[in-house]
């Protein structure tokens, strides 16, 4: 269990699980880093990715191919007709999904790492900055939580021991607190969850 200032992040993650149907949620500073950690875990930690090339839509947010390359993989662009993309898509053939344009009740797809975004003016949950990984993989969840926090456990470093390399990708507690408050907008007055339509946005052709 998280301690101190990290408890509010744990509470926000629980609210994400309750709404999306995911067993676990890992809050991060942005979704680009969520994609990187999910791909890195699948590629290097468990070795589940059996190809060196990941296929994504040719029109998407520019950081997506960046994170694929950062995770030691190559990019193949799949042609997109029209000027927009809508909703979530798989980073083929992996378990990782880009869900920047999809955030709604019971959205979680089993056996995936779904990366959601709270950054920018167009997202359904607008925190100005932030993202999360939704997963049902317990071991992956444990790794993600430490990887985002410089390899540390959610305790004082005076009480911790250090046996893992990580990154500084954690969500600031004040953003988690704001997110926890804003999650109430996704419920009806009787407590039932609301459905949000997938977003559709124009992106440049990166191919």
Show which residues each predicted segment covers.
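A glycine-/small-polar-enriched, mobile loop at the entrance of the PLP active site in fold-type I
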Residues: 1-10, 184-187
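PLP-dependent aminotransferase-like
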Residues: 40-107
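Phosphate-binding glycine-rich loop
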Residues: 10-53, 67-71
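Alpha-helical elements of the RecA-like P-loop NTPase motor core of helicases
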Residues: 36-37, 65-66, 142, 177
């Amino acid at each position: 269990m998280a301690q101190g200032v990290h408890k509010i992040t744990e509470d926000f993650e629980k609210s994400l699980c309750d709404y999306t149907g995911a067993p676990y949620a890992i809050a991060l500073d942005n979704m680009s880093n969520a994609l990187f950690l999910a791909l890195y875990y699948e590629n290097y930690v468990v070795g589940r990715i059996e190809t060196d090339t990941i296929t994504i839509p040719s029109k998407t947010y520019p950081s997506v191919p960046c994170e694929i390359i950062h995770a030691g993989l190559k990019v193949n662009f799949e042609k997109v007709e029209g000027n927009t993309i809508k909703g979530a898509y798989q980073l083929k053939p992996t378990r990782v999904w880009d869900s920047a344009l999809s955030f709604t009740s019971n959205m979680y797809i089993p056996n995936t790492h779904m990366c959601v975004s709270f950054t920018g003016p167009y997202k359904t949950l607008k925190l100005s900055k932030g993202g999360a990984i939704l997963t049902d993989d317990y071991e992956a969840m444990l790794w993600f939580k430490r990887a985002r926090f410089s390899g540390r456990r959610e305790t004082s470093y005076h009480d911790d021991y250090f046996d893992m390399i990580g990154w500084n990708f954690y969500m600031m507690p004040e953003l988690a607190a704001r997110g926890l408050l804003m999650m109430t907008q996704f419920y009806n007055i009787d407590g039932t969850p609301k459905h949000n339509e997938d977003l559709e946005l124009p992106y440049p052709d990166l191919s």
